[in-house]
Amino acid sequence: MSRFRILSVGRGMPKHEKGLFDDYAGRMKRYGGLELVEIAEGQRTGKESPATRSKAIADEGERILEKMDKRLWMALDRGGKLLDSETLAAQLLRWQEAGDRDVGLIIGGPDGLHERVLQGVAFKLAFGPMTFPHMLVRVMLAEQLYRAMTLQHGVPYHR
């Protein structure tokens, strides 16, 4: 059984996305559980200078690093590896078999993750070159974790 934790920059989810996330989190209970920890977003105005944007990313990075415990960590990153669902399930299983039962996943803010956070993870995962709303990425990640667990346990969910 693995316990999964998602650290995600941004607070609050719209009702529909929250309902979807909560559905997958509920399904994950039988596989060890899925927890969401929200990280406050760095201050942005929409017209900030590169220095202000860098400070916001650094502030978010500090808050993320404070929440990272001893579990194995993955980060969603545009430059990360593209995996299909079966390969993600197999990778998670390899980590579990190697003793890394608890896995954490990090979703950055609108400007990505600070380099210190990226240096502290074991794996960088990409959902592709497109940009997605961060609240929807939470749902997509929860669904992929659930799909991975059903693949590992032979549950007929993945087709």
UniProtKB/Swiss-Prot annotation:
Localization terms from the record: Cytoplasm
The keyword Methyltransferase belongs to this UniProt entry's keyword annotation: yes
SUPFAM superfamilies in UniProt: alpha/beta knot (SSF75217)
Superkingdom classification of source: Bacteria
Enzyme Commission code(s) on record: 2.1.1.177
Matching InterPro entries: Alpha/beta_knot_MTases, RlmH-like, tRNA_m1G_MTases_N
Chain positions recorded as S-adenosyl-L-methionine binding sites: 108, 127-132
Keyword Cytoplasm: yes
Family in the record: Belongs to the RNA methyltransferase RlmH family.
Subunit: Homodimer.
Task performed by this protein: Specifically methylates the pseudouridine at position 1915 (m3Psi1915) in 23S rRNA.
Protein's name according to its UniProt entry: Ribosomal RNA large subunit methyltransferase H
Organism: Magnetococcus marinus (strain ATCC BAA-1437 / JCM 17883 / MC-1)
